[in-house]
Amino acid sequence: MSIAQNNIGYRNKMIIGFKKYNGKILAGFYEENSHKIIDLDYCPLHTKEQNKIAQAIKNIIIKLRLPIYDEDRKTGLIRFALIRESFSTKEILVTIITASENFPARSEFVKLLRESSDKIKTIVQNINSRSTSIVLGEKERVLYGPGFINDELLDLKFQITSKSFYQVNPSQTVILYQTVEKLAKLNKNDVLLDAYSGVGTIGLYLSKKVKQVISVENNRQAVNAAIANAKVNQISNDTFILDDATNFIKNVDKKSLKIDVLVMDPPRTGSTIEFLKATITLSPRQIIYVSCGPDTLVRDLKYLLRGGYKIDYVHCVDMFCWTNHIETVVLLSK
């Protein structure tokens, strides 16, 4: 297991929820297994700059008298704030999540927010009108800057947007990806499928070791960022496909496309039976399963074992310090 050497201020992403209670605006995190907001002035898992900006957003909301969204009455405007920080370039993206597109004070909001930190490179409004606890909606509007920030990881450059899947612990991510590379034992003739690829981090990192990478991701914004990332890093052997991973792998013609190595990094909910069944049919030489959900990892591994694969190696990375979550890398082969 790779223990984190730095367990304070390690997160590059902060999500703040807002609630009005007894006339006071609360800004903080949800209490576990509830919709109760715990009002926080400072969280040690995040950087000083992220904490400073979070407090600035709260103060701006109070100053401009912006109405906080009430999930019971379905009224109000401000729902969440998302702060993403590059530890390499120090650039910061702030996304304000609103219940409707109408944001009357947005110009003043942007002005005051920019004055709070010179690290803020871009500000985005995300519109989420759904009655759900899911943070981000589908529609976005860039209020300031390019709509993304730049980050550097393992000698590669990446564009990060509000919707991009990107690991939250940069120093441990380096260890995670190096572990994947070490376990894969790739060669220059291999075709690698990077499923649930996000902004392309794993596939782009491994591209120098293989003949071809096929990266599949169902988020259009992430795919666009991945294409830009490949271009800026001058990588030409990684193909990016906008599709659901299950739908893609079910329709792969085994005769026309031979997948040698599968790298899969699904969400905490794990993969699908249809994806795993199609994987067994495709029969890649190796599967590297990267998981942040131990329960769903065990469930999916059982299916792959019944399909003829065996577990060669398991390695855990302490990605989420001070929580009961852990990142796991599993190498399987036939």
Predicted regions and their residues:
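Short, aliphatic-rich beta-strand segments
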Residues: 19, 83, 90-99, 157-161
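Rossmann-like S-adenosyl-L-methionine
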Residues: 105-107, 111-334
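Short, acidic/hydrophobic/Gly-rich beta-strand patch recurrent on exposed beta strands
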Residues: 28-31, 95-97, 226
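Short, low-complexity Ser/Thr-rich regulatory SLiMs
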Residues: 18-20, 85-87, 318, 334
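Nucleotide donor/acceptor-binding cores
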Residues: 12, 90-92, 189-190
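Short, solvent-exposed loop/turn elements at beta->coil junctions and helix N-caps
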Residues: 1-7, 80, 84, 316-319
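A short catalytic or substrate-binding loop motif that flags glycine-/basic-rich loops and adjacent residues
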Residues: 6-11, 20-22, 73-75, 143, ...
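Extended interfacial segments that mediate partner engagement and assembly in macromolecular machines
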Residues: 1-68, 88, 103
